[in-house]
């Protein structure tokens, strides 16, 4: 059980969100104009349905709120806003936060410890984030705190807790589980060889299936070039689940860039 020291400031609704400025981040640059329009429509609904709550003196403005909403809606661009029905609030700290964590061990003893967290996603509760890591999520780097926590929420739709297997057809579960565990083992092998700091995929992905799904969801949207060629079978499963192919967006964007350079000569 985690105790939260809430001192909150809620963002007020704004009918004039700065969408053009909000879209101007590397994470979203490869979306087509049609995809951007649909993402904005989802983000507007997100801001109508969810409360963004600033904690510990952090101040939200329209641009910050719009960018947060756009990133929340990127994973469900083709799934629909109803896939985010499992929570009503997004709590935002200014930086990674300390919480009091209590747990009971196998013999019934209760332990307490202060833990530093970047974010949290609860089955029947809010998503908790921090602004420093949200800012780092704007880049196309493989790290994205918002997508990580959204992936946990999507994962939880398949049961009482995150398992690494989202809500997919039953016939696909065994194959998904096989490919996910194969990826975890591959990532762990790389960690054993070069160490956590030098691994090309965040070592957190090797800790358990739920974290592997969440971490690889970050790479799926923000660094597909690191995910797709390394785990092609699992990549295809992610494409089928999210109904998106970010690597295709990347190729199209690169081709358009090459064409533009040729046209200038």
From Swiss-Prot:
Cofactor note text: Binds 1 zinc ion per subunit.
Xref: InterPro entries: MetalloPept_cat_dom_sf, MtfA_enterob, MtfA_fam, MtfA_N
Key words, A-Z: Aminopeptidase, Cytoplasm, Hydrolase, Metal-binding, Metalloprotease, Protease, Zinc
Chief place of localization: cytoplasm
EC numbers for this chain: 3.4.11.-
Protein residues bound to Zn(2+): 111, 148, 152, 211
Name the UniProt record assigns to this protein: Mlc titration factor A
Function: Involved in the modulation of the activity of the glucose-phosphotransferase system (glucose-PTS). Interacts with the transcriptional repressor Mlc, preventing its interaction with DNA and leading to the modulation of expression of genes regulated by Mlc, including ptsG, which encodes the PTS system glucose-specific EIICB component.
NCBIfam families: PRK15410.1
Organism annotation: Salmonella newport (strain SL254)
Assembly: Interacts with Mlc.
Pfam family, one: Peptidase_M90
One record GO biological process: proteolysis
GO molecular function, one term: aminopeptidase activity
Gene: mtfA
Main EC class the enzyme belongs to: hydrolase
Cofactor needs: Zn(2+)
